[in-house]
């Protein structure tokens, strides 16, 4: 199987319990976060004490590209939504937008499957954040990897000002540990 640097990093992480530092609030206007009944993806994410972001989600038939397999754009969205959370780890007021995504699909992402999306700690260079991560299938194998470049918006930017107005809600179920 062909691999790349991000795949190798993600494959080297031991599958074990990781202590949750805190859950990540979500917004009703967020496509990735809001409940499926409201058209969202219902991703729930957590910061761990070992500096990962770990999220859970369950794939569904309505987001298939081929029968039984999630659409590639949906796979990209799972990764973008979760990796982006590393930009807010130290300061929730930071607002960042995606500049570039390098994405590799390793295995089909089947429907009706609980997945884990994991983001490594960000590499930061001024306003630029570089985050790597993966989607794990229930058997621990990697379905997709990404390296995403984000840029932080300036505080007086119109988009950033609107983002600060969004109502954030707590995660419904607090976890002490999460496995990936």
Predicted regions mapped to residue ranges:
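Short solvent-exposed loop/turn micro-motifs enriched in small/polar/acidic residues
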Residues: 37-39, 96, 126-128
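A structural signal for short, well-ordered beta-strand segments
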Residues: 55-57, 101-105, 119, 133, ...
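Short amphipathic alpha-helical face segments that pack within enzyme cores
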Residues: 74-78
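Catalytic strand-loop segment that frames the active site of acyl-thioester-processing enzymes
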Residues: 25-70
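HotDog/MaoC-like acyl-thioester-processing domains
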Residues: 1-21, 109-111, 122-180
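Hydrophobic beta-strand-centered segment that forms part of the acyl-chain substrate-binding groove
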Residues: 8, 81-116, 150
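Short beta-strand micro-motifs enriched in acidic
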Residues: 46-48, 106, 120-124
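Hydrophobic core residues within well-ordered beta-strands of beta-rich domains
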Residues: 53, 97-99, 115, 129, ...
